[in-house]
Amino acid sequence: MALKHFKPVTPSLRQLVIVDRSGLYKGKPVKTLTEGKSSSGGRNNNGRITVRFRGGGHKQTYRLVDFKRTKRGVPAVVDRIEYDPNRSAFIALIKYEDGDLAYILAPQRLAVGDQVIAGEQVDVKPGNAGPLSSLPVGTIVHNVELKVGKGGQIARSAGTYAQIVGRDQGYVIVRLNSGEQRLVLGACYATVGAVSNPDHMNISLGKAGRNRWLGRKPHNRGVTMNPVDHPHGGGEGRTSGGRNPVTPWGFPTKGKKTRNNKATDKFIVSSRHKRKK
């Protein structure tokens, strides 16, 4: 879908660039495939802020998206493509031959009326899901599982995808958007195609209020705070912080490596950092 620009009648409309969603379904979601969603405002069960700069925003209904594609071997037809406020990608309502309905992530080039299926051997066309081992090398995929049966975890945001680049002793080598190459079990499922709404990266919200509609509050830098609020706070006039960048809790940030999962290091064939050198 194309980007939408506006006549510069106001300063915010001059800056505003959004995705044209005129081709999406305009009604309400299927009620049986939705759940209520309460807003936490960034607070935990003690009422304390655990995630800063969250709060407000429009009330949202959660759509139950099928990341597992559990109904195997049953063809389904795409009934409509919908907007989902909980994610950057669009979702597709599919209707199985036996009448069941489900939401899936809508890939690019998937249209209303297209047939999709999940199974052990499927055609390489957008929306079909199958084990990584059954898909040819070079295939563009999304919604990739890391554990068999857990559901897709990789490449679910708007415009993202992964590519199958090789095979190795029951594993498949997958190249991610970051440049990382990773071993994933061949039995893990993935869906063919790249995720819809690739223009999401080009939008401009135009005004602060649109950020508030999304539940995001103003983000304050540490150097603008008082010493009681942040290690960079205080000082007479404008100061640079006077130390290496740290988080509000004193831990190093801005370039400090935070990965701490040695158990899965063996599955990383090529680091995403190698591409930068």
Swiss-Prot record:
Domain of life, source organism: Bacteria
Gene3D superfamilies documented for this protein: 2.30.30.30, Nucleic acid-binding proteins, Ribosomal protein L2, domain 3
Any GO BP: cytoplasmic translation
Keyword RNA-binding among record annotations: yes
PROSITE patterns given in the database record: RIBOSOMAL_L2
An annotated GO cellular component: large ribosomal subunit
GO molecular function, one term: transferase activity
Entry keyword set: Ribonucleoprotein, Ribosomal protein, RNA-binding, rRNA-binding
Segments of this protein annotated with the region Disordered: 222-277
Database matches in InterPro entries: NA-bd_OB-fold (IPR012340), Rib_uL2_dom2 (IPR014722), Ribosomal_uL2 (IPR002171), Ribosomal_uL2_bac/org-type (IPR005880), Ribosomal_uL2_C (IPR022669), Ribosomal_uL2_CS (IPR022671), Ribosomal_uL2_dom3 (IPR014726), Ribosomal_uL2_RNA-bd_dom (IPR022666)
PANTHER family, per the entry: LARGE RIBOSOMAL SUBUNIT PROTEIN UL2M (PTHR13691:SF5), RIBOSOMAL PROTEIN L2 (PTHR13691)
Quaternary state and interactors: Part of the 50S ribosomal subunit. Forms a bridge to the 30S subunit in the 70S ribosome.
Function recorded in the entry: One of the primary rRNA binding proteins. Required for association of the 30S and 50S subunits to form the 70S ribosome, for tRNA binding and peptide bond formation. It has been suggested to have peptidyltransferase activity; this is somewhat controversial. Makes several contacts with the 16S rRNA in the 70S ribosome.
NCBIfam families given in the database record: rplB_bact
Annotated family: Belongs to the universal ribosomal protein uL2 family.
Name by which UniProt lists this protein: Large ribosomal subunit protein uL2
Native source organism of the sequence: Xanthobacter autotrophicus (strain ATCC BAA-1158 / Py2)
Gene name of this polypeptide: rplB
